[in-house]
Amino acid sequence: MERIYQKYTNENTEIFTYRYFDDTKYHLTNNQENKTLILNESSGYLFEIPTINFEFDYSLSSLRCKYFFDNSVLTTSFENKNPYTDKKEKGWEIYLKEWLIPYLSNDEFLKNNQIEKIIENNHEHDFLNKYERYSFYLHIKEMPENYYPFYCISIIRNKNNYKNFYLFVFKSKTNQIDTFEKICKSFKEIQKRGKALNVQVEYQPIADENWNDETKKYYAKLSNQKSIDWGIFTKSLVSKQDDAFDYISNFYKNEGDFYDKNMEHNFELLPTYMHISWAGKFNYFPKELANEYAKGDGFNKKKVLHFTFQYTASNNTSMVGYTPVFDVLRGKYDEYFRLLAKDLKEYHHPILFRLNNEMNTDWTSYAGIITLLDPDIFIASWKRLYEIFQQEQVDNCIWIFNPIAITTPYSNWGEYLNYYPKGMVHMLGLTAYERGNMKKYHSFAMMYKKLYQKNTPYFVKFPHIISEFGAGCGGEAVYDYEQHKYLFLPVCRNLDKQVNFVNKMFDEIKKYPDYVKNIKAAIWFSANDYANVNNKDYIMNYFCLDEKVAPTISAFKKGFKKVGKKSKK
C-alpha cells in the first residue's frame, strides 16, 4: 500500500487503520479538501467519499461495508459468486439479467410500486477505460421523512472478468446523484491483500419483557428442552371472512388428526401461513380455527400455533407486480397491522411468529432482489411491524428469523446475515430441502450440519426451529437446465430414498450431535410444488405425506418411537 499512500497523502492527510485479523482497511482523510479515501485492501478496491465526517460498519466485511454521512448511506460489496463463468460473456449476461437487475430495469415493476426513475438507466461500456458500469437512479415516492427515498445503484465490472464485480448502493434523503457519480468515478481496483472477515460475534436472543406468563414459560421450556417438537403442514387455517372457511373447517374436522393417528404421535405444533392479501382482499388472523385446533402452551397437550406471515399480495407469484413492502414503509398497512396485533394478543396463547421467511432468495415478494438490492429495506419493514406489535402490547409472539439455507441470488450483498433484524428476534428458523428429483440425494445430516456451521458463531445462543423442510420422493415434471426443457418421469420413483432420509434423520436425532442440540422444533412441509407445462399442472416436488408414500409415514412412526416421543393414546 506504500505507493498508494504516496499518491494520495500529503501534509493534510490523516490515516486511520481498521484491522481485524487479516482484514485491513485504511481511511485517508484530507481535512483541507474535506474528503476521505477508503482503501479496502482485503477486497481489493478503493474509492473516495466527499467528507471527513462519517461513520462506518465493517461488522459484515466479507459481505458488505457501510458508510453513513450527510443523510445518506453508502453500501459497497465485492461480488464473486457468479456460477456461470464457464460461459464467459454470455454467463455474465445471464447472471446480470436473472439475479441483479430484473426489477431495477423493469418499468412495470417500478410503476406498480410507485418508484420513478430520476434519470434513465445508464450502461457505460467503457467506464474509466477498463470497466463496464450499469447504473440506476430511482426515487421511491411517498416515503416518510425517516427513510431514504433516493437510490443510486451501480454495478462495476472489469471488462475482462466475468466473475468478479463491485456493487455500490447509495441511498439518501435528498437527490445526491452528483455525489454518487463522484464516488463511482474515484473507484479503482488495487492489489488484494489479506481476507475480508465478518466480526465473529454471538448474537443474543433477548426474551420480550412484555410476554405473558404462558409465553415466558413456553419459551423457557422450548429453549432448554433436549427433544424436538414436531408439526406437519398440510393446509393453512383461514378466518371466518375467507371464502374457503367451510372447506378448511371440514378438512380439519375430518382429517386434522390424520398424522397423529397414523404416526402414533401427539404433534406439538400446528403450522399455518397467512399473506397480507389475495385477489385484492385482506386476509385476517384465523382466530376461530386457531382456538379450536391449537391453543397449545407447551404443557397442556394441545398444539402450539406456528404462524407464518408474509408481505405478499400474490402468494409470491407475480414478481413484477405489486409488492406490499414499500407500502409497509409508507405506513399504508399500519391500521391493518394494528388489527392483526389485537387479534394475536386476544388469542393469548404462545405463537411462534415467523415473518417473511426465505428473504435471501429470488422468489419471495420481499426478497432483496426486489427491494433495490438493499436488505436494509427488509429490516425496516420488519421493524415497522415489530414496533406496532410493541405499541399494541402483543404479549404472546415469539419472533422467528428464517432465511433459506442457500442464498439465491448467489451473492455477498444478498447473504442472510445482511437481513438480520438485530434485537427483534427470539428464534432462528432453518430451512433446507432435499427435493428428491436427482440421483444425488442429500441426507438430513448433510444439510443441517452444513447449516449449523454456517450459523456458527452468530446464532449458537438461539433456540433453532426447522420451520419448514422436506425430502421429496420424486416429482413427475422436472426441469433440465442443460436441455432447457421439462423431463417427464415416474412419480415417487425415489420413495426408497425418502424413507432412508427419514430413518437416518431419526438416527441422527437420537445420537444428539452438536448440530441437533439447538434444534427445538421441526415442521415437515406436506404439500407438493407444481409446474405448469403446456397449460397443465404437474407435480414438480413431491413432499406430501399421503397414501402413496405409506412407507415414509411408517418410517416417521418408527422414528418417533426410536427417539422416545410419546405415542397417541
What are the residue ranges of the model-derived segments?
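Conserved polar/disulfide-associated segments of primarily extracytoplasmic proteins
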Residues: 52-159, 165
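Substrate-binding cleft of extracellular glycoside hydrolase catalytic domains
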Residues: 278-398, 490-493
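Substrate-binding cleft/loops of secretory-pathway carbohydrate-active enzymes
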Residues: 404-431, 476-482
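Aromatic-lined carbohydrate-recognition surfaces of secreted/lumenal glycan-active proteins
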Residues: 382-413, 461-475, 519-527
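Substrate-binding cleft of secreted/luminal carbohydrate-active enzymes
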Residues: 197-253, 463-569
